[in-house]
């Protein structure tokens, strides 16, 4: 499966709220929109309209990753995920793995240390080593769920990204573009310096030639 940014946010919110606020789960469209637009525990912070969330929900419904539920005597439709750990889902995750996947869907690439710090409401990890063990299990599958990103300058730990959405492919394309832009910028800077010097030398040569001509004319007039 490959989820869009909005679809990944919807699935992440449903996974999160099922664990952290089970009394409010499943979620109505309004509650789901509020969850998608939270200012905390979300990266990037979005400002989705209910229409945008509904479009994502409808798409997930067609992918059989969401189901609708309405109570007796209530016209409000509520939504629950079929992403994992349901009788309709092929994907079965441990509580630890579910917490990591949920956080990566909601907050993008993160280090094991960040995942441990941010996971306390979803799952209690004993230490970072336990997080790293779980990450390895999610990566060492026939079809991996996570991948490791190159370590960034100034970071002691590498970040990991989930492979359920388009986020990883966007990161892969963004990094070469950034690198090529940097190389191009350096090349232009290096090329620009000799060009400026050449131009300056040409101007000076012209000035010297003009002065020489005027001097010759002055000498000729005096003789």
From Swiss-Prot:
It comes from Shewanella baltica (strain OS155 / ATCC BAA-1091). This is UPF0502 protein Sbal_1765. Belongs to the UPF0502 family. Transmembrane segments: none annotated. Pfam families: DUF480. It comes from the Bacteria.
């Amino acid at each position: 499966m490959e989820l869009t940014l909005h679809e990944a946010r919807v699935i992440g919110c449903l996974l999160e709220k099922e664990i952290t606020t089970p009394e409010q789960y499943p979620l109505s469209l309004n509650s789901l929109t509020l969850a998608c637009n939270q200012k905390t525990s979300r990266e990037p912070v979005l400002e989705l309209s209910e229409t945008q969330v509904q479009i994502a929900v409808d798409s997930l419904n067609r992918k059989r990753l969401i189901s609708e539920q309405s109570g007796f005597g209530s016209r409000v439709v509520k939504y629950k995920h079929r992403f994992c750990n349901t009788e309709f889902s092929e994907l079965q995750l441990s509580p630890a793995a579910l917490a990591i996947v949920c956080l990566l869907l909601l907050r993008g690439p993160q280090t094991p240390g960040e995942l441990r710090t941010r996971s306390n409401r979803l799952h209690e990890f004993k230490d970072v080593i336990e997080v790293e063990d779980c990450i390895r299990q999610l990566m060492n599958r026939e079809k991996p769920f996570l991948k490791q990103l190159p370590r960034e300058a100034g970071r002691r730990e590498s970040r990991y990204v989930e492979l359920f959405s388009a986020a990883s492919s966007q990161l892969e394309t963004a990094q070469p573009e950034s690198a090529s832009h940097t190389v191009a910028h350096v090349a232009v800077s290096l090329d620009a310096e000799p060009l400026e010097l050449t131009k300056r030398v040409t101007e000076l040569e012209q000035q010297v030639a003009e002065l020489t001509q005027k001097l010759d004319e002055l000498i000729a007039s005096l003789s």
